[in-house]
Every structure is written in structure tokens, then in C-alpha cells.
Amino acid sequence: SSAASDVYKRQYAQYVIPVNAKNYPIILWHGIGQSGRSFETTPDGREGFQTLLPRDGWATYIVDQPRRGRAGRTEATEAKSEIPTVTSEAGVWNAFRLGRWVPPKPATANPNMQMLLDGETINQFMRMQTPDTGALPPTEAYGWKLGEAMRDLLKRTGPAVVGTHSYAGQIGWYGAMKSPDLVKAVVTYEPGQVVYPEGEKVKEMNSEIPLVQQRLNPVRVSKQEFLKLTKMPIFIIFGDNISTKSS
């Protein structure tokens, strides 16, 4: 449809290229309900990857994915959101594992948080959330479109290391399979979905939340596509305060 065909044309990227930059730039894709703003500074005022990486010699590109933030221009007529992190502040609090918040009860915080949880920090954190301007279909066709968007950027940057967070994990997989000649490595923070070859069995994972259940299902691709990922370095990082029981 026309609403889907324009998706790869509308992404946004900002960049900082230091003098005598290292061989490969780093491209950063934000998570769900977020924009590239999340890589600029932390909510409590500390430096983000936007300045930390260039200071260490890395050319750094920060993306706003299509239909989000500064890439919000779309031909889609609907503004549908199925994502908890863009429907309520409590959903954001829980999804980012700051603690537990089930209104009307007050929010509680997880212990040993590195991020300050004072009023102004929380205010800034919530202001980083931004809605979608069109549907983000959880389909293979849409995933490949986002992979094309990454390839369009890679054609301009040259070979690069791709860094993704949460929902953008799938963009990293599709992008790497779309451009194995240009993606030199993938670094992904808590990827929202994983990739498996068609026909390979995986342990069933269940959730009472329909969206989570949907995202727990792996992205299925041909073995030929999957093998492309096995030929590049991949670093997967998970954080703390991950629940070990159903909630």
C-alpha cells in the first residue's frame, strides 16, 4: 500500500564525525516509544553516546526510525499504537524496569538504580517518550522495509557497526541480513525479538500480555538469510532487574 511503500523514505539521522575517526562509524537505533533523543543525554543529565563515542574516536549516527520522532512524516492515515510504553507513564515505568507501578497504587522503584529517581529526572525521562505517527506492523514485509531503510543509510555512511535497543533489535537483524556487505558487527541492548531459521524448533514462551506474547515469537527467515548473521560479530547485552516470574 502507499502507506507502507513510503516507510523507507522517511527516516532521520543526525551525526557527529570526529577528526581522524576510527575505521567504522557506529549507527544507533532507539527502542520502542523512543527517538534518537535517548542517545543524546541521560534523563539525569549525564552524557550520552552522542558525545561519548565521538570523543573516543567513533563517527556516530543517531537514527529516528520511520513514523517516530523527527521521522514522523508518513502517508499512513491511522495513528494506531499498540505499544504499552507509549500509552501510559505506568507502562513506561514498568517496561524500562525502573520499578513496579500499577495505578491507582503509587510507583515503587527497584533498588540500586544507577539513574537518579528524583522528580526532575523522572520528568525528563517521561518527556523522552514519543508516539508513533502510523502503525508499525509486526510483519516480515515491514521488517524488510526497515532493513531497506538501514541499507539506504549504510550506502551513505559506508561499512558500519550497528547498535540497537529493544524494539530496534529486529531492525538490526533485518538490516544486517539486507546488507551483510556493509554491517561489520551488531551490538544490541535487550533486543525485542530474535531471529531463527524456518523450521528450527524453539522452547515455547508464554505471556498473559498479548503484545509481549507476539514479540516473544522469533522472526522466522530462510536458512540462507539466517546464515548471513552467523558470519558477523554479534554482541547481545541484557541489563538488571529482569523479572523471573509472571507478573
What are these regions (language model features)?
Residues 163-172:
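Gly/Ala-rich beta-loop-alpha elbow adjacent to hydrolase catalytic centers
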Residues 193, 198-247:
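The feature captures the conserved acid-bearing segment of alpha/beta-hydrolase catalytic domains
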